[in-house]
Regions:
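Vicinal oxygen chelate
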Residues: 1-2, 76-129
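N-terminal beta-strand motif that seeds the catalytic metal site of vicinal oxygen chelate
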Residues: 1-20, 63-65, 125-129
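Helix N-cap motif at beta-to-alpha junctions
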Residues: 15-16, 69-73
Length: 129
């Protein structure tokens, strides 16, 4: 049924202008459409997109979008240069501990988490070979 469908993350924003500035200016995504509701569509890699819409305050305590990257250290360095602050976690029950904002999970994955201007938790991740 949905095995060939493209998934599009949908994120809330209290201040759509502020969110747009972050996603365009800080993350480098391109606005590819606007919705009068109001909302914006942003182009991500490999033909994927995000939809961000304005709504009253809301919070999520989990990752809502993860961007797959080839070099997590280089991406984290560039995002830090642009003012992004990475979260630090130490969760022994999950075997999860960040070092300088990046967690290595076994021998298969690295991830780093940060918040957008609206409090949504985003991540960059790299599969390890």
């Amino acid at each position: 049924m949905l095995t060939n469908a493209t998934a599009r993350p949908t994120l809330p924003a209290v201040d759509l202008k502020r969110a747009r500035k972050f996603y365009e200016g800080t993350l480098g995504l391109k606005v590819i459409g606007e919705d009068p509701s109001p909302g914006i569509f942003l182009q991500a890699g490999n033909g994927t997109s995000l939809y961000i819409y304005q709504r009253a305050a809301t919070t999520a305590d989990h990752t809502v979008v993860s961007f797959e990257v080839n070099d997590i250290e280089a991406e984290a360095k560039e995002l830090k240069r642009k003012g992004v602050k990475f979260e630090e976690y130490d969760i022994p029950s999950m075997g999860l501990k960040t070092v300088n904002g990046i967690a290595t999970m076994g021998n298969y994955r690295k991830s780093a988490w940060f918040k957008d201007t609206e409090g949504n938790i985003l991540a960059i991740a790299q599969g390890l070979k």
